[in-house]
Amino acid sequence: MTRYIFVTGGVVSSLGKGIASASLAAILEARGLKVTMLKLDPYINVDPGTMSPFQHGEVFVTHDGAETDLDLGHYERFIRTTMTQNNNFTTGRVYEHVLRKERRGDYLGATIQVIPHITDEIKRRIIKGAGDADVALVEIGGTVGDIESQPFLEAIRQLRFEVGARRAMLMHLTLVPYIATAGETKTKPTQHSVKELRSIGLQPDVLVCRSDHPIDVSSRRKIAQFTNVEERAVIALEDADTIYKIPGILHSQGLDDFVVERFGLQCGGADLSEWDKVVDAKLNPEHEVTIAMVGKYMELLDAYKSLIEAMSHAGITNRTKVNLRYIDSEDIENQGTGLLEGVDAILVPGGFGLRGVEGKITAVQFARENKVPYLGICLGMQVAVIEFARNVLGWKDANSTEFDRTSAHAVVGLITEWEDATGAVETRTESSDLGGTMRLGAQECQLEAGSLVHDCYTKDVIVERHRHRYEVNNNLLPQLIEAGLKISGRSGDGALVEVVEAPDHPWFVACQFHPEFTSTPRDGHPLFSGFVKAALAQHQKNS
């Protein structure tokens, strides 16, 4: 019988509901409970797949191929449960489903309304997403008071009433600001945020109070009195020097004990030793490297959230401080490769569109010719193939049909047919919709024995997640191979190029998949770990 913890946020956005929720989930998992998490997004887009990275940040891809909110990445990094398409849904997805049922006549002529039809669909999806977990944490996006969030808040109010207080509770994150001129933290914004919640029938059971200063006992007592929340359930969550400290901070204040007692759960104590090791390795590195990350969305680093975290995990695995030097690929186009001088390795991540592509190609050339360790991901692999074709094969017009459909040497082109994770055949054309039409989700990849990538994984077959609609053109592959390009990974059916390596280079690996989506702080990821090891070797060589 699943218990539900609904998580809301107030006062301001970006308080870290996802991190706080995932940290609590990690503690409950460490106590032996089966835990899952859901993210409910109030925007009207069906999913974030076509949203600008500058507005939404990263699109996290699940094992089963859903394009989801970046918070699902936090969830998978903190708990062992693999997220699916059922763990994230939007207002747009809910309305799309309800309207489709209305068109079919499923409602038998009833007037379709927010209550009960939309709220019932939200509740149905929450219950389905929770599955058979002992505890499901359900995060509602946005801030209490937003018009967009109202159907979700009403739905959780109803569900909380239907399952009862022993199976549902509400955790509310608020901001307790520090006023420097007064020299104290202020509780009034939290009081008003809870007042807003209570006006719609929701009484929080737990308050997590975010602040950049310590919150004293008297302030916590005052918050408890004015919000009708138990004092021990008013949790102070001050800014930490690493997010992986948060499970320990919440546990030290007894949040998991409160949840377990409230739900009447039978479980053991929390063993957070794995998290202690992560924090120790993160804060006490023995080495240091500088890696250039060349992308086009550098104004909003959340666009690369999982990748940045994966590099941090690789640093933890190697007890190495990884300094990422963020370089806009357009700056390389305008200022040259001097921006890359002195780095220990170069990373080119995925992306879409023509802007900044030539800068990425220049970065690849710099890495290949100067023997600097290189890791290319998704588009980072495609530009590696383009660069090789231009500067080794001599095809100066080599390109991708994404950027130039008239190129005589289109070494990268649209995938028109492939098998998805279930074995079903997918087909696409240039006129297909952008939303939900890419090669998505987990796919098998066969690795070439003796290759750099095989040395990293130490496996013949791996499974990694994809999000792309362009691939290496097999028609021109023989010439690329003859010129020395190494194909060290292919799709399970052998039809698509998945990994390439450059000849006569200490460490040059480019992959079509997104390994960052499966990296975790406790386990790291073999490819990123190998990349950081190569950067360490380069650093020692340059020292």
Curated annotation (Swiss-Prot):
EC number: 6.3.4.2
Highest taxon of the lineage: Bacteria
Residues binding Mg(2+), per UniProt: D71, E139
Pfam families given in the database record: CTP_synth_N, GATase
Residues that coordinate or bind CTP: S13, D146, I147, E148, K186, T187, K188, P189, T190, Q191, K222
Ranges where the record places region Amidoligase domain: 1-265
Role, per record: Catalyzes the ATP-dependent amination of UTP to CTP with either L-glutamine or ammonia as the source of nitrogen. Regulates intracellular CTP levels through interactions with the four ribonucleotide triphosphates.
The protein's name in its UniProt record: CTP synthase
